[in-house]
Amino acid sequence: MRPSTASTPLSSSALNYLESFERNAKALRGNNNGSSTSGGNKKDESSTSKSIVSSPAPVKRRVSISDIISQARRQVSLSRTDSEDFDFLNESLKSSVFDESVSSDTDSEESHEEKRILPLGTPGQQVGRKSLKDIRELRNSIDQSLIKPPELKMLRSKAAGEESKRHAHFESIQEEEKISEDLPTAQLPSKSPFKKAIQSGSESSDSDSIIFDEVFEEVLPSPPRKPAPARTAPIVVEKKIEKPAVKEQKARKKKEKTPTPTESSFESSSDSSSTSESSTSSESSSSASESESESKSESQVSSSKTSTSKASSSKAYGSDFESEKSSSSSASTISKVTPKKLDKPQKTKKPDKKRAKPDDIRQNKKPEPIPYEDFIPKLSSRSSNSEKSTVRETNRTLEESLKKTLKINKSSEKMEKPRKDIRRAPRSSSSSSSTLRDAEREQDIERRREKRARRFRSRRRRSEEPHTCQENIHNMIESVIDTHVQMLDDFNRMEYAAVCEWTQVLRKFDGHDGPSSQKLREIIERRLNRKY
């Protein structure tokens, strides 16, 4: 029924609109058929039979919509520019199809021919019942579909969904990036010392608002190595022993100074005497000489203290050899200080106070042998295991032992000279008891020297055994071979014991000859001759 697009000036939307009207008309036709059957049930059977007989051949027939559409198309083809006729057709269609008086109850009693808009009996196109509201909804949906087709809607919704998904994906990525960026920024200000100053907004640099402990907890350098206690202990012992001697000399000085003003006051009151003046002058000169000697000894002690402090600081950062040199040198300086302190007061003091001197000498002499034992390097695990030691350890032990022997010999030679001076002084001044004590001390010192000499000899023997890398490697290979040989010996012993046991079993079975004994012999021979 559709003409070609070239002959019709109507647009595709208008043609679709007309086709929709045809569909609505067919729907109304089915609706009218249903209403006629419902109205016929109320009437008598005679009237229904008459209507059924008269329905296939009606007297007057209304024009169908299909006829109207065909007429409209013909008119449009004849007069293409007449738009008024098209408007009239639309109005007539609207008034005929969408008339509300059709569905009213008052018109149900009228004849079916007047009611019927569309003719019955259109073949093969019976549509179910539909009310006018449904038809209007269909029409509105068709109009909306002409304005906005559903395909575009679906496409737009899909595109919008994809865009929204992409947008959400990008937002999630941005949030993750923000979180990852926020994490380090949250950690950094906790460690920064300027956090509180920045938060408070104070322009002045307050020392209270800046906490430097947070920063320098991790950056603090590791403390230097503490020096070995065996090397520093003897120096401290001598310092402690030297202090009481200095205090005693100061106390004596005060005692000697106190009578001088009293004597001078008595002399001024009595106006007599050159003798008392000479005594006071001699006492003052002796006190002056004592003060000078004390100042010298104190300066020497302070210098020795500084040297020991330098030695202890050098121990932390220097090598072991330097620390040993410094300890031996500090020991020699302290030993030099002690005899000077003891010799000078002897010349200045009077012979009445000579009896008190040996006690001071004993106090200073008692601790003297202590530091030399401590300065002797003790036998370490290195020297005891030097035969099986590695290359580095053997070389170190050699160098250390040789240097230590040289240093200790020098220090012992230096220390012998002041000891001889100290021995001479008490012999000339002290009693027989002091000489006995000195003899005992000398014997103890000689014994200690002998012990030291024995130790040095044993060390030299041990250190002289491995000299070169080649010998060290040779010793290592020998030890490895020894272990392997021991393992092989153990294995051979076990194997021999097993063979002996099996041979004893065989000898026992030799007395019982038979088929079972022969089988056992074969099995035992197989097991003994098995190649592992």
Swiss-Prot record:
Q: Enumerate composition-biased segments (Basic residues).
A: 347-356, 449-461
* Sequence segments annotated as region (Disordered): 26-84, 97-129, 157-470
UniProt biased composition (Low complexity)? 30-40, 198-213, 259-290, 298-315, 326-335
Tell me which domain of life the UniProt entry assigns to the organism this sequence originates from.
Answer: Eukaryota
Per UniProt, the ranges with Polar residues bias are: 67-80
Basic and acidic residues bias locations: 157-181, 237-249, 357-368, 389-403, 410-419, 437-448
Q: What is the protein name for this chain?
A: Uncharacterized protein F59B10.2
High-level lineage = Eukaryota, Metazoa, Ecdysozoa, Nematoda, Chromadorea
